[in-house]
Amino acid sequence: MSYRKAAVAAVGLALLASGAHAAPFEAVSFKKGQSALVYDVGSVRREGAMAQAWVYQIVAAPMDGASMVATFREFSCAMRRTRDIARRFVSPDGQTLRSVETPGEWQDVAPGDERFELMQQVCTGKPQRIAGQQMSVFDFQTVVRDALGAR
């Protein structure tokens, strides 16, 4: 079974069994090795050639206790660059382990870069939605980690 089919099946089951722990979000997901890169369609804000969105990297095996990194990311669509404005490192149970509130440096994003497809989706506003709409990000994290075979 492919990753997307497994994630969709797991999301469907989780929707039946779970309650929301945080505000619902609309997810679009990109698989990235043993992690998934997800952004909240509802958080996208555009002004001219600039866009901002909440992006979540969910990992199968926690790194320093964090199973998810929630990043408020800014995109310079015309210049094909991106930077992180703020980041939160979150445990599997939704606790913030640490946060970084200092904007990072701009980084160029070229075709082939893992952030390229994400930037195109955020900048063009044509996401392909997946199952799991209106789940909390924490419930979604659990479903994605299960689909990734979390340890």
Language model: regions and residue ranges:
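Bacterial N-terminal signal peptides that target proteins for export
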Residues: 1-8
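Intrinsic disorder/low-complexity segments in short proteins, especially the signal peptide
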Residues: 6, 18-21
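Bacterial N-terminal signal peptides
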Residues: 9-17
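N-terminal secretory-pathway/extracellular module detecting exported/lumenal segments
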Residues: 20-71, 75-151
